[in-house]
Amino acid sequence: MATHRPGALVGDVLMATPGSKSPVYVVASEDTELLFLPFHKIMSGCENCCAWHTKLRENLVSEIAMKFWAQRRRTLYLCAKSLRQRIAMRLYDEYQKNGSLTFSLGGTREDLADYLGANRSALSREIGRMKEEGILDFYKDTFRILSLEKLTKDVG
């Protein structure tokens, strides 16, 4: 299940699939407006070849590409040999993204466990071990990498 913010795209990755019913179900937790855009109209544009249609297509392709890379990264996490390696990979990626040894992942420990395909208590136990080994420190969703060298060894 995914939570979307205002302005997010839903079903964009599936919109070009011909003749199949979407497996995506959307449930709104508050009043919501959805804009349905027919794929053929997006791709064909208008008779004026206006910049708006070009920009819409560019934005759509960019959004789909970002989702692809996020899913690819998550697949790499899930293919890791151990939970420790998955944790190390996730934390190292966040370090590279932020350029800082201290960062917040956002969400709960349960969210992180779900994302990494793990049990929450197993995840908590493993990050506790990593803390004892001087690899990292943490408080709630905020992590600080204490030894980048040790963390990268766990990344593999």
Task: Show which residues each predicted segment covers.
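Cyclic-nucleotide recognition modules
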Residues: 1-61
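Noncatalytic linker/hinge segments flanking ATPase motor cores
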Residues: 2, 23-31, 45, 67-83, ...
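Residue-level signal for pocket-adjacent positions within structured domains
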Residues: 5, 10, 70-73, 98, ...
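Generic structural "secondary-structure junction" signal
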Residues: 6, 11-12, 16-17, 77, ...
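A broad, structure-centric signal for solvent-exposed, well-ordered loop/edge residues
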Residues: 10-11, 17, 33-35, 44, ...
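Polybasic "coupling" helices that flank or enter modular domains
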Residues: 29, 51-117
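Phosphate-/nucleic-acid-contacting segments
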Residues: 83, 90-156
